[in-house]
């Protein structure tokens, strides 16, 4: 709800409902990216992100019907279309469009609407995530998944062999 209140502070400049929703979504995106970026600077989280990359590599190897060996896994991409990181980003994007359908005034109603619509936004975002995976091999349509893949450049790191071994198990 912090982005809602931050956006409200900009109401004298961005007074239309559409502008308020865009500003709110921008604040959500900035907070998400900033949080992940600064979190990734810590050694512990960098290691977690390496395990995350290892997990994706194993899934990619499995989906290509290759033998699951450290060598085969290490040759795979650390990015994956069905990643939870992509899902989080899609909730921001989908939320922006869903919230265009509800009023932004008064502020208390906007806060209630945001909370009440969480299941709707999550459900639509999940379907978008599934769709991006289904169309990932279709030129042009695979672009739908790119924002999530770009976010994974922050949330995954190249793993070491030991981390791949753990992911295989």
Where are the predicted features?
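Juxtamembrane "helix exit" motif at the C-terminal ends of alpha-helical transmembrane segments
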Residues: 1-15, 91-115, 119-122, 126
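Alpha-helical transmembrane segments of polytopic integral membrane proteins
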Residues: 3, 7, 32-42, 51, ...
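Polar-ligand-bearing catalytic/cofactor-coordination segments
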Residues: 18, 22-29, 33-86, 134-136, ...
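Short hydrophobic alpha-helical module
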Residues: 41, 48, 61-64, 88-104, ...
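Accessory, usually C-terminal, subdomains that scaffold auxiliary metal cofactors
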Residues: 112, 132-135
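Alpha-helix N-cap/helix-start motif at coil-to-helix transitions, marked by capping-box chemistry
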Residues: 119-122, 141-145
